[in-house]
Amino acid sequence: MGEAVAGTVGERFRELYGAEPEGVWAAPGRVNLIGEHTDYNDGFVMPFALPHQAVAAVSRRDDGILRLHSADIDADPVELRVADLAPGSDKSWTAYPSGVLWALREAGHELTGADVHLASTVPSGAGLSSSAALEVVLALAMNDLYALGLRGWQLARLCQRAENVYVGAPVGIMDQTASACCEAGHALFLDTRDLSQRQIPFDLAAEGMRLLVVDTRVKHSHSEGEYGKRRAGCEKGAALLGVDALRDVPYADLDAALERLGDEEEVRRLVRHVVTEDERVERVVALLESGDTRAIGAVLVEGHASLRDDFRISCPELDLVVDTALASGALGARMTGGGFGGSAIVLVEAAGVDAVTKAVEDAFAAAGLKAPRVFEAVPSAGARRLV
């Protein structure tokens, strides 16, 4: 598949720019198995890469010009001056790739421009890190073409800075690290404080199970308000408890910490979610490493309840997916991603895939909702050069 995609993207690059690209790169979207809204609290996460990916054909320029083109937009390439790139200067889709060049230059790397053609199969607005895939694929291309010598986690940090400062979205580090560092057949157990990581084998098919992603097709944007409010509330909780981040509140001390927060009810809810979610990540790692994979289903259900009731970022469509899937025999289910729409994941026996899928589709139809998009999530390769 990689060669075919590279050929198509390379051919379009030639049509646009009249020359061969110097290379073609790919970076995947991700789904988060467990560990939601913990990354900006220095906590634990456990994503894996999807087969859906952003692909970029790229060549260097030496005249300070950056030209960007997307296969999704019927328009000529957007032309920008590298020296003029600045936070807030770009409000369109091009902010994600141009922000990467800005972040690399801010970090002291001399980049003299590029011609870029981008194509992506990562669903936008589905909570599957379409923006991170765009950032990481261009960062990897720049790293290779300009021989910057940066490692995956370093590229992820720069991409996060691009999205935080240049785009203005207060995202954590998980999405970019997952896209840059995941390995096929594994979930990534990531400590977001120091970016230490462990690849955990995750082969559901070998155990007779599947993980479905259900895209509700309800769109959301991290840049709009609610995500930032949750992050600010978590930071307030850490300050009130006298810790650097909520990751520093031990699970065993949670009740005492909640008592100390007194009548700060909203902050109490946010703190409870983050501390218990970190514990859930560690529990899932232990279950997978001990071979008790089916037992992670119950942990997913716990996580959804916490996101719905404490963090309050679910929505009726996500709850409908989870409730319907569980009623139809799924082993576990929860919302995934930033919330307020997007996707849910469903752990199901292989023999039950069709029944659960039909039940969810029928439930959406009965509720008068747009048909959800359902697909199997297979742990796939992280960012890499195709050609």
From Swiss-Prot:
One Gene Ontology biological process: galactose metabolic process
EC number(s) from the headed UniProt entry: 2.7.1.6
Gene Ontology cellular-component annotations: cytosol
Enzyme class per UniProt: transferase
Residues that bind substrate: 36-39, 227
Key words of the record: ATP-binding, Carbohydrate metabolism, Cytoplasm, Galactose metabolism, Kinase, Magnesium, Metal-binding, Nucleotide-binding, Transferase
One protein family per Pfam: GHMP_kinases_N
Cross-referenced Gene3D superfamilies: 3.30.230.10, GHMP kinase, C-terminal domain (3.30.70.890)
Main location: cytoplasm
Record InterPro entries: Galactokinase, Galactokinase_bac, Galactokinase_CS, GalKase_N, GHMP_kinase_C_dom, GHMP_kinase_C_sf, GHMP_kinase_N_dom, GHMP_knse_ATP-bd_CS
Pathway assigned in UniProt: Carbohydrate metabolism; galactose metabolism
Keyword Magnesium: yes
Positions with a binding annotation for ATP: 70, 125-131
Residues annotated as catalytic: 175
Binding site for Mg(2+): 131, 163
Entry's localization field: Cytoplasm
Catalysed reactions listed for this entry: alpha-D-galactose + ATP = alpha-D-galactose 1-phosphate + ADP + H(+)
GO molecular function: ATP binding; galactokinase activity; magnesium ion binding
Site for Transition state stabilizer, residues: 30
Family named by the database record: Belongs to the GHMP kinase family. GalK subfamily.
Function per UniProt: Catalyzes the transfer of the gamma-phosphate of ATP to D-galactose to form alpha-D-galactose-1-phosphate (Gal-1-P).
Protein name (Swiss-Prot/TrEMBL): Galactokinase
